[in-house]
């Protein structure tokens, strides 16, 4: 009985070690990612306003088209019955 218990404890220990290893890896990845993102965002922020305006106008036109489509759909539904 005592032998099986010691085996189980050693297994759980190895599992916890592998978990801590994967955690440290994910932590290092997150740090490197956040660093690269910060550098990129700083360089991009200078050229952002122009692209922002264009994307905003595009999204507005898209939403208008979708609104018109939904209106035409509702009209066709009301006409059919």
Curated annotation (Swiss-Prot):
Q: What is its subcellular localisation?
A: Nucleus; Nucleus speckle
Q: What is this protein called?
A: Serine/arginine-rich splicing factor 6
Q: Where is this region: Disordered?
A: 1-81
Native species? Oryctolagus cuniculus (Rabbit)
A molecular function annotated in GO for this UniProt entry is: pre-mRNA binding
A cellular component term, taken from the record's GO annotations: nuclear speck
Q: How is it modified after translation?
A: Extensively phosphorylated on serine residues in the RS domain. Phosphorylated by DYRK1A, probably in the RS domain. Phosphorylation by DYRK1A modulates alternative splice site selection and inhibits the expression of MAPT/Tau exon 10.
Recite the UniProt keywords alphabetically. Answer: mRNA processing, mRNA splicing, Nucleus, Phosphoprotein, Repeat, Repressor, RNA-binding
Biased region (Basic residues) positions are 1-48, 72-81
Record-stated family: Belongs to the splicing factor SR family.
Keyword Transcription set for record: no
Q: Which gene encodes it?
A: SRSF6
Basic and acidic residues: bias regions:
62-71
Q: Which domain of life is it from?
A: Eukaryota
């Amino acid at each position: 009985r005592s032998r099986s218990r010691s085996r189980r404890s050693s297994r759980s220990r190895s599992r916890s070690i592998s978990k801590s290893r994967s955690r440290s890896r994910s932590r290092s990845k997150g740090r490197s990612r956040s660093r690269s993102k910060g550098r990129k965002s700083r360089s991009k922020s200078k050229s952002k306003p122009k692209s922002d305006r264009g994307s905003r106008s595009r999204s507005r036109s898209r939403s208008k088209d979708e609104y018109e489509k939904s209106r035409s759909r509702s009209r066709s539904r009301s006409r059919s019955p």
